[in-house]
């Protein structure tokens, strides 16, 4: 009998083991769709980004005009740009839901997969930040100035580090050029990290909503989950195209329609919506270094999740107290996001400070305590 090429060819064999014959738990829900959606997002962003880069000029005098030219004069340039800008928002929606799923169902106990995932998140955040600077509008310029300036809070080497990042003594042409280079490079680094992420995942196999070993009940990835992923893809593309076609500037800042001007500061400098929770935590501490440390901790705290898991059960499916705490955490993140978009004045300052304290308290103190308490409740 002739060998099956899909199972014998060195390259096709890898694809087969990852996407076709992969044994998958039969009970994984739609929350497991977001990994494949993130892959689709990445491919879409790389494709639209490549097309945009063909018409973009990384020069302070021409950047803003080149983006306007792309939207006005390039065939479907407006659509490519709108898909790219709003695609970033969908990328973050998917990654936050993906992390939330991992947190709820205890997927962080696959330590290597979880850690590479956090590195992926950090790389994505860096990519989105440098990308936001490229149109060289007011918010691009001042966002770049404010965020890069945070590195000056690092003792001893801070100021040198900032000037090295800027390529001068302020955000100017060298900064824009290197940000464009980084924005072009980093998505490919994300693609490479994704392969590492998947390699670690396929070592153990997927987790499932019950958090128990599912070796006795696994089904092939294709056709069952390929079809399910196509449904998820369709359900994501519909709102993305609707947003890009009907309300492309809904999530953007009006300030970015004004070309960058170092002499005029916008009344309220704020990042895109997907960074607002971290920005609110940064602003909640009146000390510069303290704020920077809190900002870093807001994401890096995820590295501690596997070590703070004290419950005997892996997932929160049958842990009502942890569930309650989880949804309080989600609500708290929405509050932080809202506060980050508001001006620095009463009552937003105190709300931001309370929400920041709550965020770290839930993650570092309450989750382990509640996990231990639920273990005791199992004995009753």
From Swiss-Prot:
Localization, per the record, is:
Mitochondrion inner membrane
Q: Report whether Metal-binding shows up as a keyword of the record.
A: yes
What organism, scientifically named, is this protein from?
A: Macronectes halli (Hall's giant petrel)
Quaternary form? The cytochrome bc1 complex contains 11 subunits: 3 respiratory subunits (MT-CYB, CYC1 and UQCRFS1), 2 core proteins (UQCRC1 and UQCRC2) and 6 low-molecular weight proteins (UQCRH/QCR6, UQCRB/QCR7, UQCRQ/QCR8, UQCR10/QCR9, UQCR11/QCR10 and a cleavage product of UQCRFS1). This cytochrome bc1 complex then forms a dimer.
Q: Which GO terms describe its biological process?
A: mitochondrial electron transport, ubiquinol to cytochrome c
GO CC, any one term: mitochondrial inner membrane
Cofactor dependence is on: heme b
Q: Which PANTHER family match?
A: CYTOCHROME B
Q: Which UniProt keywords apply?
A: Electron transport, Heme, Iron, Membrane, Metal-binding, Mitochondrion, Mitochondrion inner membrane, Respiratory chain, Transmembrane, Transmembrane helix, Transport, Ubiquinone
* Bilayer topology annotation: Multi-pass membrane protein
What sections of the protein cross the membrane? 34-54, 78-99, 114-134, 179-199, 227-247, 289-309, 321-341, 348-368
| UniProt-recorded name of the protein | Cytochrome b
This protein's gene is called MT-CYB
Where does this protein hold a ubiquinone? Answer: 202
Q: Which GO terms describe its molecular function?
A: metal ion binding; ubiquinol-cytochrome-c reductase activity
Record-stated family: Belongs to the cytochrome b family.
What is the stated purpose of this protein? Component of the ubiquinol-cytochrome c reductase complex (complex III or cytochrome b-c1 complex) that is part of the mitochondrial respiratory chain. The b-c1 complex mediates electron transfer from ubiquinol to cytochrome c. Contributes to the generation of a proton gradient across the mitochondrial membrane that is then used for ATP synthesis.
Q: Which domain of life is it from?
A: Eukaryota
Per UniProt, what is one Pfam family of this protein?
A: Cytochrom_B_C
Q: What else is known?
A: Heme 1 (or BL or b562) is low-potential and absorbs at about 562 nm, and heme 2 (or BH or b566) is high-potential and absorbs at about 566 nm.
> Does the UniProt entry include the keyword Membrane?
yes
Positions bound to heme b b562: 84, 183
Q: Where does heme b b566 bind?
A: 98, 197
């Amino acid at each position: 009998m002739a060998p099956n090429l899909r199972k014998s060819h060195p390259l096709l064999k890898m694809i087969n083991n990852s996407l076709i014959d992969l044994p998958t738990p039969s009970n994984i829900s739609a929350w497991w769709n977001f990994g494949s959606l993130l892959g689709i997002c990445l491919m879409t962003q790389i494709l639209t980004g490549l097309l945009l880069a063909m018409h973009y000029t990384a020069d302070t005098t021409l950047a803003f005009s080149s983006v306007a030219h792309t939207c006005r004069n390039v065939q479907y340039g407006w659509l490519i740009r709108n898909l790219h800008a709003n695609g970033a928002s969908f990328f973050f929606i998917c990654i936050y839901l993906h992390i939330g799923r991992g947190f709820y169902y205890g997927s962080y106990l696959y330590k290597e997969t979880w850690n590479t995932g956090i590195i992926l998140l950090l790389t994505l955040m860096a990519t989105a930040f440098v990308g936001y600077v490229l149109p060289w509008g007011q918010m691009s310029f001042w966002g770049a100035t404010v965020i890069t300036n945070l590195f000056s809070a690092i003792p001893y080497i801070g100021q040198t580090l900032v000037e090295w990042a800027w390529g001068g003594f302020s955000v100017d042409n060298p900064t824009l050029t290197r940000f464009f280079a980084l924005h072009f490079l980093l998505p490919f680094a994300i693609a490479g990290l994704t392969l590492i992420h998947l390699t670690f995942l396929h070592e153990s196999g997927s987790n499932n909503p019950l958090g128990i070993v599912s070796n006795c009940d696994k089904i092939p990835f294709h056709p069952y989950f390929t079809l399910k992923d196509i449904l998820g893809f369709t359900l994501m593309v519909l709102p993305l195209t609707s947003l890009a076609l009907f309300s492309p500037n809904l999530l953007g800042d009006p300030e970015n329609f004004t070309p960058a001007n170092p002499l005029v500061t916008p009344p309220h400098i704020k990042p895109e919506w997907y960074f607002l929770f971290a920005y609110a935590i940064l602003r909640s501490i009146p000390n510069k270094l303290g704020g920077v440390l809190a900002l870093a901790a807001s994401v890096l705290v995820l590295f501690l999740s596997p070590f703070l898991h004290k419950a005997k059960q892996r997932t929160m499916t049958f842990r009502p107290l942890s569930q309650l705490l989880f949804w309080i955490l989600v609500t708290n993140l929405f509050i932080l996001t809202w506060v980050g978009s508001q001006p620095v004045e009463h009552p937003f300052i105190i709300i931001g400070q309370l929400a920041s304290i709550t965020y770290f308290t839930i993650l570092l103190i309450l989750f382990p305590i509640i996990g231990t308490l639920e273990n005791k409740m199992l004995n009753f």
